[in-house]
Regions:
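Conserved catalytic or metal-liganding residues and their short signature motifs at active sites
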Residues: 2-263, 290, 308-311, 315-323, ...
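Conserved SxxK-family serine transpeptidase/carboxypeptidase catalytic domain
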Residues: 263-311
Length: 364
């Protein structure tokens, strides 16, 4: 009898690893790592170099678009990778109507990435600068001075300074006296401060200077702040020596009390546009036809001849008390003056000083 045997099962093939799965996983991780690295570089990696000589600033004028801004950022040393910033800016829609470029003066934060820098520029959070207000003799000099430090419209500033109706309504001054509003020193201003706001900031500083004490001191002299500033402008042009300022202020106050003309040489040079350039006053200058000629007209001139520093203003408010009515610069070049009570004494001092100018061949 034949015996039927069950078939012997065939063993399964040996297990082999699925290499394609691993390769796909590795490839996917590599892509994700690359995308993450690219995103980090574009958004967060430092792009603003470390400042070498102090903070770096970015100035953006009104009306500047994205293209002009990117051109300025491509300048050497501004950004490490300007192309990256340009890509991120366009990706976020910066420079469009929804996210316009904000004018201003921005401190570039050292080590900042593109996203932080963009957020700063989008916010318009500019910082202030230290505006240095220097003395000036004539109104047209101020817009030029302001235009060198701020982005304001200098033509508009000049229009405001020469608009009597505006000056009277806003500050109670006119074109002759508006320079008394300006007290040289430092103001904290935005680079984009408009012309009208600039004048308001100057006026605010003026109000802070004229505190209760100074107003009382002016009142004791029977003078207004404007009159104090006019006299202080003359004192400032007469001497740079701090200790002589109260003495010279006392001389002019003595003359005013006695009804004598001030006879201040700097007031002759102002209408001749000679302040800062002329070194000698001649007798012919005393005939100049001007309300600023204090040889021909008694009292104070109609306005200041320069913008006086606080020290000159305080010298008038707190003058030296004496009987001097004359003074003359010393010939030693020290900047000090010799003071006298009589014309005879003064004439001797003046003759000595004139001989000194002659020896130096200073004719004008």
């Amino acid at each position: 009898m034949t015996e039927l045997l069950a078939p012997v099962p065939t063993p399964p093939p040996p297990h082999r690893p699925r290499r394609w799965g691993w390769l796909l996983a590795v490839l996917l991780l590599s892509v994700l790592a690359g995308v993450g690295s690219l995103a980090y570089r574009l958004l967060y990696a430092p792009n603003v170099p470390a400042a070498v000589d102090g903070p770096a600033y970015l100035y953006i004028r009104r009306g500047v678009g994205l293209t002009a801004l990117l051109d300025s950022l491509r300048q050497p040393g501004v950004l490490a990778r300007p192309a990256d910033f340009a890509w991120v800016a366009r990706w976020r829609g910066f420079g469009t109507a929804a996210h316009p470029v904000q004018p201003g003066r921005y401190t570039l934060p050292a080590g900042a990435g593109n996203l932080d820098l963009l957020r700063l520029l989008e916010s318009g959070r500019q910082d202030t600068l230290a505006f240095t207000l220097k003395p000036f003799h004539y109104l047209p000099q101020l817009p030029r001075q302001a235009g060198r430090q701020l982005s304001l419209d200098t033509t508009q500033l000049h229009k405001l300074l020469t608009n009597n109706a505006y000056l009277t309504r806003r500050y109670g001054l006119d074109t002759a006296t508006v320079r008394t509003l300006f007290i040289p020193g430092t103001l904290r201003l935005f680079w984009t401060t408009p012309a009208a706001a600039f004048l308001d900031s100057v006026a605010a500083r003026h109000r802070r200077f004229w505190n209760g004490r100074r107003l009382a001191e002016a009142d004791s002299l029977k003078m207004s702040p404007v009159q104090v500033a006019v006299l202080a402008s003359i004192v400032q042009r007469e001497t740079a020596q701090p200790t002589d300022k109260p003495l010279i202020a006392g001389v002019y106050l003595n003359r005013l009390r006695r009804g004598q003309p001030l006879q201040a040489d700097p007031t002759l040079l102002w209408p001749l546009h000679g302040l800062g350039t002329r070194k000698r006053v001649l007798n012919v200058d005393k005939k100049v036809d001007s309300p600023y000629n204090t040889y021909r007209h008694k009292g104070l001139p109609p306005g200041p001849i320069t913008t006086p520093y606080p020290q000159a203003l305080d010298a008038v408010l707190r003058p030296a008390h004496h009987n001097f009515v004359f003074f003359c610069a010393r010939p030693d070049g020290s900047g000090f003056s010799d003071f006298s009570e009589t014309f005879a004494q003064h004439k001797a001092f003046a003759r000595r000083f004139q001989h000194h100018l002659d020896s130096l061949k200073i004719r004008r």
